[in-house]
């Protein structure tokens, strides 16, 4: 699963927000995630890790997670370019149509 697909899931976006500013243990992420099971949180963390959105660091028995801001920012930059190009084309088409309607 790529980063875009991984972030399509609302709980994963919530988890990413939790680990954006600081490293957190899996248990802390679970407690902050509301009514979701620890197993589900672990699955979401695995998907986010495999997609490159978060990094995991082992500290003894603890597993610490932190957002990979560089990877997420690269995705955002790609999306901005994509939407910018499409919006520019839409603007051009709209202006042409408006011009044709004036004639």
Please state what every model-predicted region is.
Residues 49-60, 64-66:
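Beta-hairpin "wing" of winged helix-turn-helix
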Residues 54-56, 71-74:
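Alpha-helical interaction segments
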Residues 17, 21, 73-103:
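Amphipathic alpha-helical dimerization/coiled-coil segments
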Residues 45-46:
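Short, hydrophobic-biased segments on the C-terminal half of alpha helices
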